[in-house]
């Protein structure tokens, strides 16, 4: 984020509201970076400083699930675009292809199942929130190594299912 803030000449503010509790769980590499980049590039990157461009990163745990949400107060999207952005047959306007989002969504679902992935909420001229939904996998060296090697769910090493 520091590089992006420098690139955009500190034109936006980033706030974090991440529960300490979720620091004890593993995640998949490179899933939040493309979402943050989208929030900057398509959300707040072209806003005037007078419009108070802001990105909020939230993280919390609910039962056996972890949620990481990136919200911006940028231009937002039409509901039609929101519905299509994560579909294989997506039809999104040229200003955003959605490839980064569909890539992250697909990787999460391949590893953990269809109940996990991304949730996209947006309103035109209000902003966008992309929420990452993951299983709560305890942070251990073994679990993290299994995720790195593509084991879908730690504890299922013998399933022969790899990504």
Give the residues covered by each predicted segment:
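Two-component histidine phosphotransfer core
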Residues: 1-121, 127-133
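C-terminal end segment of the histidine kinase catalytic
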Residues: 118-163
């Amino acid at each position: 984020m520091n590089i992006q803030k420098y690139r955009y000449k500190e034109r936006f503010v980033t706030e974090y509201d991440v529960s300490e509790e979720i620091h004890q769980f593993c995640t998949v590499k490179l899933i939040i970076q493309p979402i943050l980049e989208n929030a900057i590039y398509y959300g707040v990157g072209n806003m005037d400083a007078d419009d108070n461009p802001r990105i909020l990163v939230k993280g919390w745990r609910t039962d056996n699930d972890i949620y990481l949400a990136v919200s911006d107060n940028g231009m937002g999207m039409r509901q039609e675009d929101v519905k299509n952005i994560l579909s294989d047959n997506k039809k999104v306007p040229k200003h955003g292809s959605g490839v980064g989002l569909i890539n992250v969504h697909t990787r999460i679902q391949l590893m953990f199942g269809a109940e996990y992935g991304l949730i996209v909420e947006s309103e035109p001229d209000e902003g966008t929130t992309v929420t990452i939904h993951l299983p709560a996998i305890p942070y251990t060296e073994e679990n993290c190594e299994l995720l790195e090697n593509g084991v879908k769910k730690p504890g299922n090493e013998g399933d022969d299912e790899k990504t």
